[in-house]
């Protein structure tokens, strides 16, 4: 029962509607890899229409039905990976998706500012995927943070330029030993810097 209560709290906190939470709990539907694959295929089908409005609507539908973590990890990221690996995929479609995803992330950031929360800065560190950086900002926003984003990833973050601010750094992978050493050094200097993964 405690696990069930925790699941309800997690779903509600992540923004899943009350009706959807009730439906998920009544059905006790467990999302399997096959379920995620069919949802990913739905998104690929909508992408083929090359319609930003249809794509925004589908992402909005998925957002109402799934927690932000699940949406990013099980739908958006796999679809983006498929598009980047598919030699037949037109770069225009991948770029269209990224544009809609950034718009989605920015809307999530704006929505989070309407609620109580703490301010933080998100910095991409030695990473190339700007779109995923914005998705990670949306993920943090769903966890109650008011996130500001440095739009361009930085090779060498300088927390001293942002005194007194809470800083999250994101690399898209586990920190290297050098990055971990720098994180520890910054913390020793009194900066509030966390690795976001």
Regions found by a protein language model. Give the residues of each.
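Generic helix N-cap/helix-start motif at coil->alpha-helix transitions
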Residues: 35-37
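Residue-level detector of family-conserved "landmark" positions at structurally sensitive sites
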Residues: 19-21, 73, 150, 196
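Helix-enriched interaction subdomains in cytosolic or periplasmic regions
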Residues: 51-106
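Basic, Lys/Arg-rich alpha-helical nucleic-acid-recognition elements, primarily the DNA-binding modules
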Residues: 1-33
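Short secondary-structure capping/turn micro-motifs that flank functional sites
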Residues: 27-28, 79, 156-157
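Amphipathic alpha-helical repeat scaffolds
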Residues: 9, 40-48
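C-terminal regulatory/effector modules of DNA-binding transcriptional regulators
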Residues: 103-197
């Amino acid at each position: 029962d405690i696990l069930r209560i925790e699941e309800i709290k997690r779903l509600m906190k992540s923004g899943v509607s009350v009706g959807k939470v009730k439906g998920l709990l009544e059905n006790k539907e467990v999302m399997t890899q096959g379920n995620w694959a069919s949802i990913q295929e739905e998104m690929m089908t909508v992408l083929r229409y090359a319609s930003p409005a249809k794509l925004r609507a589908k992402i909005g539908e998925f957002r109402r039905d799934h927690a932000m973590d699940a949406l990013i990890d099980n739908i958006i990221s796999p679809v983006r990976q498929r598009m980047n690996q598919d030699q037949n995929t037109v770069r225009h479609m991948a770029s269209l998706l990224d544009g809609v995803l950034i718009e989605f992330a920015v809307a999530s950031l704006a929505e989070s500012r309407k609620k109580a929360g703490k301010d933080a800065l998100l910095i991409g560190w030695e990473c190339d995927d700007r779109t995923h950086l914005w998705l990670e900002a949306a993920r943090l926003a769903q966890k109650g943070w008011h996130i500001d984003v440095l739009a361009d990833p930085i090779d060498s973050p300088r927390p001293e330029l942002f005194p007194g601010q809470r800083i999250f750094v994101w690399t898209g992978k586990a920190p290297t030993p050098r990055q971990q050493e720098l994180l520890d050094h910054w913390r020793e200097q009194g900066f509030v810097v966390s690795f976001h993964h």
